[in-house]
Amino acid sequence: YGYYKSKEELFEAIVGEHYEYIRNRFIKAQQEFAELPAAQQPEVMSDISGICMYDILYYAYEHLEECKLILCCSEGTKFAGLIDEMVEIEVDGTHAYQDVLRQLGRPSPHIDPSLEHILITGMFHTFFELIIHEMPLKDAENYVREMRAFYTAGWMKIMGQ
């Protein structure tokens, strides 16, 4: 690692700001959504998450090498946990949204926590595959649109909406 005491320090120097951007952009979208009036949330859920996904996609393509290092080479550092962190944030957001649906008189059936974790993890892995495999940006944009339609329909079905 030369100038750095550890892989962790090296990765902090190379990818730290990019990891923080992706993580913080996702958190910001979750917070913006949670701060909306309850009645408005079902109407704009897909819009806010879509904007966030495209923002992260474009950012990752602008910083492709660094983002690929996070996704493919960060084992043994805190950066390897990016997807797991995003999954936990999404799980919490899903539970908060279920509370909103209950408040609106549109309760969601119980979702098995293991299934919920598997589906959300799969969703993020699917998204990040676009970056890992360096899909042409136009293709990646189309794939994100299709993935959003697929996952939105699935979640709406599971949530009884």
Residue ranges and their predicted role:
Residues 2-5, 9-35, 47, 51-55, ...:
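Alpha-helical structural segments
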Residues 70-87, 139-155:
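C-terminal/domain-terminus segments
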Residues 51-62, 76-103, 113-121:
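Amphipathic alpha-helical packing segments from all-alpha helical-bundle domains
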Residues 34-44, 103-107:
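Short helix-coil transition/hinge motifs at the ends and kinks of transmembrane helices
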Residues 21-32, 66, 122-130:
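Solvent-exposed, amphipathic alpha-helical segments
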Residues 34, 38, 57-77:
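Amphipathic alpha-helical segments used for helix-helix packing
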Residues 97-150, 159:
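Hydrophobic/aromatic-rich alpha-helical bundle segments in the mid-to-C-terminal region
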Residues 19, 43-65, 121, 125, ...:
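Amphipathic alpha-helical segments that line or abut small-molecule/effector binding pockets
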